[in-house]
Amino acid sequence: MATKASNDEAAAAAVATVAEKAPITAERKVRTDLETKLHNPYMPRALAAPDTENVNGTTRSVHKHQNMSVLQQHVAFFDQNNDGLRAMGFNVVSSFMFVIFIHGAMSYVTLPTWIPSPFFPIYIKNIHKAKHGSDSDTFDTEGRYIPSNFENLFSKYARTVPDKLSFWELWHMTEANRNALDVFGWIASKFEWGVLYVLAKDERGFLSKEAVRRCFDGSLFEYCAKMRSGGDVGKMD
């Protein structure tokens, strides 16, 4: 009997997500029900960005993966005709500043050669090399999307509304994700999430789970460009 109780205790400890002496593990809860809602939630996805509400990712009628990794899809919108930022509604000054920061920081690591380019191009084929630290780890180091890490963004930090993030919840998330001494990662993370918040927040000042998911696969940018041009985009909750 004692052996059975000991085995039960060991089994419970083996899957525990909270440690009593580490209160932060209780404060930032992780999802324990994902396997009942999403097939293989811990398996990195190369082509699609699913969540518990969209188990196959963004529908093909809205967004096509073109056999690119999810990280490649995330940046490909801006390579279509060199005016992606303008198509989303950012003015010339903002677009210029974004280009300086993004290309200045990420161009060299994606180049196919050791020789720098004065034009600061970003090669989508090598965009996985530009993954920085202090991020959400929703992308792995090869540019695949990890559904469980995406879901945990909201279980950990969405306190007001379960599937939305307020500005301060977003700020808290970027603070919590900081790696030691990673100054570039701290700045890059604040910049990226700040731009996303300005771009996609709703009328109540929340950033929805669906907007964040579609940012990861790049379909959010297509949605915003179509909406700005007066096209039929449907509803995105």
Predicted segment positions?
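Acidic, Asp/Glu-rich intrinsically disordered regulatory regions of eukaryotic Ca2+-responsive proteins
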Residues: 1-237
